[in-house]
């Protein structure tokens, strides 16, 4: 499901409208998609409430919308900035195409076994934060601008090296 379409579906849902009445200050902080067969049509949106320092995720599925349990937010040095979907000019399909091309060009021997992405506003700007887990137990992470599709940062790391 396309992100903007999923967000519209969320905004129209009775469950979200009811929740928003008691969380008027909360704002959209991220959109998360796991690209496996079981979840590829689902989008999770996280709404941050700065008064309570809590995140409430909503799962948008093809046939239903549901709130998931709220949780405390892991605090890093970086503050949580609103995700303004109107600023997202790149489609998730195009962002994934850019990431896939980068991986094939720079790491042709790596075979992805799991892929997910988060759209969020970081210090680098608003990005598609895409991660590939590979068959060789490595991760490729790319941060791609939602405006122009440029890769603003990437890293390639072994999951095993950190365990030894």
Language-model features, listed with the residues they occupy:
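Long, terminal "pre-/pro-" and other extracytoplasmic accessory regions
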Residues: 1-164
């Amino acid at each position: 499901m396309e992100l903007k379409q999923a967000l519209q579906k969320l905004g129209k849902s009775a469950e979200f409208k009811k929740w928003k009445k008691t969380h008027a200050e909360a704002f959209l902080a991220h959109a998360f998609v796991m690209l496996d067969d079981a979840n590829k049509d689902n989008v999770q949106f996280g709404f941050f409430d700065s008064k309570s320092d809590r995140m409430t995720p909503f799962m948008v599925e093809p046939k239903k919308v549901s709130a998931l349990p709220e949780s405390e937010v892991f605090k890093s040095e970086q503050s949580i900035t609103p995700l303004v979907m109107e600023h997202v000019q790149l489609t998730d399909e195009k962002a994934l195409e850019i990431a896939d091309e980068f991986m094939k060009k720079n790491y042709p021997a790596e075979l992805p076994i799991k892929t997910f992405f988060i759209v969020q506003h970081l210090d680098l700007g608003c990005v598609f934060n895409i991660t590939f887990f590979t068959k060789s137990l490595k991760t490729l992470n790319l941060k791609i601008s939602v405006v122009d599709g440029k890769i603003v940062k990437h890293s390639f790391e072994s999951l095993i090296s950190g365990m030894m």
